[in-house]
Regions:
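Modules that initiate DNA replication and primer synthesis
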Residues: 22, 114, 140, 169-222
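Conserved phosphate/metal-binding and DNA-contacting active-site motifs used
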Residues: 1-176
Length: 222
């Protein structure tokens, strides 16, 4: 893989709106002297990317997923106990941009749905990567390359991907409970609200008469 091809690849990814940053050659660690904040320094700026790879021509290519509006299912398919095949049996996995990782796993890259959260583990041997980053072809790790299985555009992330996120499930449950509790509280107080409204309405009707009445004492009422 030539230096020119690596730079061209990084610039090509950036032209798609993907936020790119340099990673230490043959490693997964951000290139510290160039990106002090790691993947948070990722950019789409062609000028900045050219400057980085001019200074570090052999740097791996890192992709900040969240900043790029992407989410990745990282499947360790090379592990004997990987549970992805069983997990996906009753679900639809859209065809999408797919990459072979250097370790022998698979990256399914999707467009993230706005407002969804994608942290944590999907199942045994499968991670959902969103808040961090992945390496892109033609990067290498421990001498092994990343390479694309296809050149498809990232498909929209399936709904079940977000639903599997513990944080997303907890947030949805909390919102539903809050809405239900609020509605129940309002309904319970409704009779009292109606009663108070009627009293106020009647008081307004009698107010002119009361104003015309002369003051009187309690003894006058007996």
């Amino acid at each position: 893989m030539t230096t020119e091809t690596k730079v061209s690849a990084a610039l090509s990814y950036a032209s798609k709106g993907w936020h790119i940053f340099p990673v230490t050659p043959n490693k997964k660690i951000p290139y510290g002297s160039l990106v002090s904040k790691g993947h948070l320094n990722a950019t789409t700026s062609a000028a900045q990317i050219t400057e980085w790879w001019t200074e570090a021509p052999n740097a791996n290519i890192g992709l900040n997923l969240e900043a790029s509006g992407l989410v990745c299912i990282d499947v360790d398919s090379y592990k004997s106990d990987c549970g992805f095949d069983d997990f996906i049996k009753d679900k639809h996995l859209p065809q999408t941009l797919t990459q072979n990782s250097a370790s022998g796993g698979t990256h399914y890259i999707f467009k993230a749905n706005s407002g969804d959260s994608y942290p944590g583990t999907l199942c045994k041997g499968v991670d959902i990567k969103y808040n961090g980053y992945i390496l892109l072809s033609p990067s290498c790790f421990d001498g092994r390359p990343y390479d694309w299985q296809n050149d498809l555009e990232p498909a929209q992330a399936p709904d079940w991907l977000a639903k599997q996120s513990p944080k997303a499930q907890s947030l949805r449950h909390h919102c539903c409970q809050c809405t239900l509790s609020s509605n129940q509280g309002y309904l319970k107080s409704l009779p009292m609200r109606v009663g108070i409204t009627r009293c106020l309405s009647e008081w307004v009707q009698w107010l002119p008469v009361v104003r015309m009445m002369k003051p009187f004492t309690v003894s006058q009422m007996i």
